[in-house]
Amino acid sequence: MNRYGIQFQVKNSPSLDPEFMPILKFNRAFLQSAKKPVSFAVERSNGQVAVCNTFIHGTPDMREADHYYADRLVKSMLWLQGGFKVYVSGDEDVYNYLKETFSLTGKRAFDADFMAGVYEQPFEVVFCDKVPEEKGASQAIGRHMDGCRIGFDAGGSDRKVSAVIDGESVYSEEVVWFPKTNSDPDYHYDGIVAAFKSAAEKMPRVDAVGVSSAGIYIDNRTMVASLFLKVPKEQFDAKVKDIYIRAARDVFGPDIPLVVCND
C-alpha cells in the first residue's frame, strides 16, 4: 500500500473497507525515512503538558505525508490526554498546517471547539523554538478504607450508592432513573442528593464522598457527560458543571472531601 508517498505492506485488507490504512503501519514506514526533528506539546489543566519528540521529512515532495502524520499525531494526543494549547517546534510549514487545520474553520473544527469547551479556554496552536517540558500530576485515588465514606455511581439507567464504615459496606441502594432523557438539571441534582442522604442516614457521620460516572471531569466539575445529554447548554453551564460539588456541599457542608472521576 502506498499513501502520500509512504510505501508499506498490509497483510489483510478488509473487504468492506479496502482502503483502510492501519496507522501503526504508516507511522513505522514514515519514520524510517523521516530525519528532520520536530516536537509537539499539548497543554491541559493545571499546567500539565504532554510532549512528543519525533521526526518528519521537511521536503516539498513529502509535504502531504508530513501533514498527515502531524495531524494524526496531534489529534491522538488531544484525545488521549486532552488539552487546549498545542505547541509546535522544528518546522513552520507543519505549524501553519496544524494552525489552520485545528481552527474553528478547519477540518478539525470539532476537536478545537470540543477541547475549548472542556477546558474553558480558547483553543490555539502556537509555534516556538522549544516546546515546554513534560509535566504530569499523579493522584492517589481510592483505597481509602478508614472512616465513614459514601460511594456513588451515576449510571445512565440507574444510580447506585453505598455507605462504607472502615472498609465494610453497611448499606447499598440501586434506584432506577432516567437522566439521559431528562432536560431539567434539577431532576439530576435531586437524584444525587437523595442518594447522598440515603447513604448518610446509615452512618454516624460522613468523612468523604466518591463519585464515578461516564464523562470528562476536571477538578470535580462535569465538563462533558452523556447523563446530561438533554440539558440545554445554558442550563448545563449554570447547574451541571458544578452539580456534584453543589450536591456534596449542600448535604454535608463546604469542607467535605469529594472526588469525581470518569469510570
How should these model regions be labeled?
Residues 41-45, 86-93:
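Structural motif
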Residues 1-80:
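Short Lys/Arg-enriched alpha/beta "domain-start" segment
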